[in-house]
Amino acid sequence: MFTYATTVSTLTSTAILAYLTRHYDPEHKFSFDDDLDVSRAEQWMAWQHGGLGPMQGQANHFNRFAKERIAYGMQRYTGETERLVGILDKQLKSNDYLVGNKYSIADIANFGWVHMLRFSGVELDDFPSLKAWWERVLARPAVQRGLSIPSKGPFGNDAYLQRLKDDEEFAKTERELREKIKAAKEQYGYKYSSP
């Protein structure tokens, strides 16, 4: 929740980003003054809020936190996350950023989920345009500062890969998890097809 006045609060990342850009980005460094680009940015923010975030969140739940491994849930939400990041990958094949060829609130809204993609059971390397975008956004000094507040977390793609290298027990557990996800997909006939 973001409280920006003594009597008004805003929740959800989409509403917070919209408020911040309306009130603190008059030069449109992260937002747009063109109506079509404003609509495109809102579209990608809503798409993340209603699609990628909930589906990847469910993939995290079924793959990581559920008391019992339920094959249908694992393949359903991992597969849906793959489908959705495939849409991002397609958008980024001919664009450096999601809207208007500049880093914007649309990228900010989607970055956090992509930053934790591997933790969700989806391999970022399978989506080369998305991976290149993630690397561009991750290289921004302000993004690095933001990721370190309060401290760098263990779920980002870079931290995940480092832990795979450094912790053999973790790597073994991850290989087993990937095998369970693969088996669940096979059990239910899931086949990824790029958009």
Regions found by a protein language model. Name each.
Residues 1-75, 79-82, 177-195:
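GST-like domain detector, emphasizing the conserved glutathione-binding G-site
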Residues 11, 45-47, 77, 85, ...:
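Tryptophan-centric aromatic hotspots in well-structured domains and transmembrane helices
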Residues 16, 41, 88, 107, ...:
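Residue-level signal for nonpolar/aromatic packing positions in well-ordered secondary structure
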Residues 23, 80-83, 87-91, 136:
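Solvent-exposed, charged/polar functional surfaces in cytosolic regulatory/catalytic domains
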Residues 26-27, 90-102, 142-146:
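Surface-exposed helix-capping loop/turn segments at secondary-structure junctions
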Residues 51, 56-60, 98-126, 131-137:
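GST superfamily/GST-like fold recognition
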Residues 116, 120-166:
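A contiguous, mid-protein "functional segment" used to position or interact
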Residues 150-195:
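Acidic/histidine-enriched, glycine/proline-rich intrinsically disordered or flexible terminal extensions
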